[in-house]
Amino acid sequence: MPEVIPPDSVGIVTPQVAQFDIPLTLECGKQLNSFQLMYETYGELNADRSNAVLICHALSGHHHAAGYHSMEDSKPGWWDSCIGPGKPIDTNKFFVVSLNNLGGCAGSTGPASINPETGKAYGPDFPVVTVQDWVRSQAMLADRLNIPHWAAVIGGSLGGMQALQWSIEYPERVHNAAVIASTPRLSAQNIAFNEVARKAITSDPNFYEGRYGEHTTYPDKGLMLARMVGHITYLSNASMGEKFGRDLRAQTLKFGLLDVQFEVESYLHYQGERFSKNFDANTYLLMTRALDYFDPARAHEGDLSKALEPAKCKYLVVSFTTDWRFPPDRSEELVNAMVEAKKSVSYAEVDSPHGHDAFLIPTQRYMDVFHGFMGRVAKEIPHAR
């Protein structure tokens, strides 16, 4: 917990809830008659409502992107390094909105929420949601907040997919989009990793076909394993080697098959156990499926440049050299399609040892690129503060 709030922090923030009692038809064909979105805001909306920035979260993210909920918090929001006074997403200049996506488990309507039609948790009956569904629900939130357009829509990983979808779906409402450590569609390898994670969850004897709540159980072992698999893909070989190497927890080998002996094993167990206590298993299944399904080029016979034709915004695309989940060549594929579609795009491949997680870590080169882009965004705002 902080003894004092740092001067470059947004400070103490209070989550808010937007309730929608109008139907939302989803891409799967099903409909939610009502739903709520949990969100936070940082900074002040200017008089002509032109300085709003939307933050889109990744797979396990949520609305709490910056600041603290109380002085007892052990750490700030998940992207606090980039949001706040003087930071790339400068809250002295921008009004920032961050939300928990539909289907999430941090306050927005999702599988753990009560289905008003049954009085029980949705569980596996919660409909499949896609990136397109998220963007449409985010547009409803923008309407509720009376935000006609975004100065920028920004996201890393799965969040970058949402930023890209925003630029295609609502071209008149997005002036700039930052697509960081992301991809225009998953590779077969990435889909395979997601399937292994889902299988780990659904194979847990406490899963009960997603109705674990009705059995007062929880598939924590399966979710722990899913997170361990996922976490490996977020790190680079170099960062794991530097942090753990082949270090042992004890001085000597135990020659046991079931003992946790290496430091890297211990770390993965810790990450998996912590995650399994704070995330909903059905939400994890939903989020990985949304990742799998995202492919804006599919409706255009695989031609990504045609999918991008409606977009009118300026893009920033950032990749990281050691990201093997969404490697630089996937960002380059996106950039090439943007160029072919005659879009305005800036691209940076940042040298970082941190793998896919590099988009969360404020290395100097990354921050320089991010600051430069957001500085240009700020200059476009009329009467920018």
UniProtKB/Swiss-Prot annotation:
It comes from the Bacteria. Substrate binds at R227, D357. It is found in: Cytoplasm. Pfam families: Abhydrolase_1. The record marks R325 as: Important for acyl-CoA specificity. Keywords: Acyltransferase, Amino-acid biosynthesis, Cytoplasm, Methionine biosynthesis, Transferase. One of its GO terms (molecular function) is homoserine O-acetyltransferase activity. Its EC number is 2.3.1.46. The keyword Transmembrane does not apply. One of its GO terms (biological process) is methionine biosynthetic process. Its main location: cytoplasm. It is an enzyme of class 2 (transferase). The active site is at S157 (nucleophile), D323, H356. GO terms for cellular component: cytoplasm. SUPFAM superfamilies: alpha/beta-Hydrolases. NCBIfam families: homoserO_Ac_trn, PRK00175.1. Transfers a succinyl group from succinyl-CoA to L-homoserine, forming succinyl-L-homoserine. Homodimer. Belongs to the AB hydrolase superfamily. MetX family. This is Homoserine O-succinyltransferase. It comes from Hahella chejuensis (strain KCTC 2396). The gene is metXS.
